[in-house]
Amino acid sequence: MLDIKKISTLSDLSELKTAYFAESTAPLDGMWHFGFVPMSDHFGFYENGNLVGYCVLNGEGYLLQFYLAPTASTHIENLFPLIVENNSSVIGEVKGAFVSMAEPQYLSLCVDNTESFKVNAMMYRQNSQARSDCDSDRIEEIEMSLATEEQLEQFVEFASSAIGAPKEWLTGYYSNLIARQELWGYIENNHVLATGECRKFDEHQTQFADLGMIVAQQERGKGLATRVLNFLKQHANSQGLEAMCSTESSNIGAQKAITRAGLSSKHRILQFDFSELKETD
């Protein structure tokens, strides 16, 4: 008999999360798994009182993670359809799922249950030969400086204007990056023209650095994004870390900049829709 309960103490899932990341075939997106997942609802799967698995559901009804330990008596192929068919009163309505191609079991479960999906984002990681900086020699260097607490408001205003993100969320997000010395700025005449993020992982995937950048609207198309990413990649490499990042599938400009900076994409993040599930016998 399997019971499903909501989990409020995420540290209870530490061992299961470690196993989940160990099964991935490539580093998982930092913003999704360390930004969005902690803000979402977690549900534990219990057999005879023992925690044997979990899933994560965001506020919009989309699964972000799904895991069942191989030691569990329950078959994951039976549990997943039960949940996505909205048969769990604890979890409630599940509209769909976000899953990357680097999560083979979770991806297979989604594909088995619906044919309705679209590409949401492209996942990139540093080309192996890029460590020698063979590409970097052809990219104009850029002077970037670490953001300070005094610059927080200026950076928040810039990002809010450039990408339309909520200021309240940006304030908390950037404040944390500044404290960790992971937020950089490219500033001319006291105006922020670009920001760069080089985020380290506290647990799981600690050999990688997750990059992010924003370029001012009026500065786009001039090669600035490539220079920022190249700076961040070199900074990551100087600390013995491999660079990775992601971008929306519709952002062609960012994809070109990322490729020029020496990163390539083999995996995608897919968005599945469970409103049309496959017929099951």
Language model: regions and residue ranges:
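Glycine/small-residue-rich hydrophobic helix-like segments
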Residues: 182-237
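Active-site rim helix/loop that mediates acceptor-substrate recognition in acyltransferases
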Residues: 21-42, 164-187
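Acyl-donor-binding surface of acyltransferase catalytic domains
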Residues: 58-62, 68-140, 272-273
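Conserved acetyl-CoA-binding loop-helix of GNAT-fold acetyltransferases
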Residues: 73-86, 215, 221-236, 255-260
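Conserved hydrophobic beta-strand within the GNAT/NAT acetyltransferase core sheet
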Residues: 97-99, 211-213, 243-247
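Conserved donor-binding loop and adjoining core beta-sheet/short helix segment
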Residues: 27-89, 193-209, 214-216
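…primarily DNA-binding HTH/wHTH and HhH modules…
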Residues: 255, 260-281
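Short amphipathic alpha-helix that is part of the acyltransferase structural core
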Residues: 1-28, 130-168
